[in-house]
Amino acid sequence: MLFSWFKIIIGWKSKSNKANLFEELVGLEWDSKAFMYGRVVNKHARYNLCFDGSSQEPDYPNGRGRIIAWDSVPLLKKIKKSLSKFINGANDLAGEGNYYYDVNKTGISFHGDYERFKVIGVRLGNSMPLYYQWFLNSEPVGTKLKIDLDGGDLYIMSEKTVGKDWKTKSIYTLRHAAGCEKYTKD
């Protein structure tokens, strides 16, 4: 049985540090395209980037997005290193960033992340709520939960909270959504 938990560390990054980290990240070239539906498409809901040991330029027709080397983002690398004090294996983690470039237009609908067991996130920039909803047989069950995240907040999502099992329709699954109302409404 999987248990769901969500941990928030309010104001984990100080005001000056989060501003510097935001500047480091916003200055990167984010993926605004992806290979989906058998073709390259423009991404309107949000932009993404991956972070790992070495850089990779995007090759969208072959399904590969941009990867930024940890050494190219020293402030983000420092966060990853500091997490290793609390989380086993954090030094071996790859990273993914979501860039909600316009909080009035961007977001992601209720979903689970079947490809990962845990999410560790730092909210930067404007405040943005994260929503959770239980589902059974692809239908929402119960009351939607809203968690407000402010710039500098660190959050950790367990395997159940990430929604790793979201494709299993016959059990209760937890899904999450973020962004503007278009993506988070019932």
Regions flagged by a language model, labelled:
Residues 1-186:
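Non-heme Fe(II) oxygenase metal-center motifs and adjacent flexible, charged/small-residue loops
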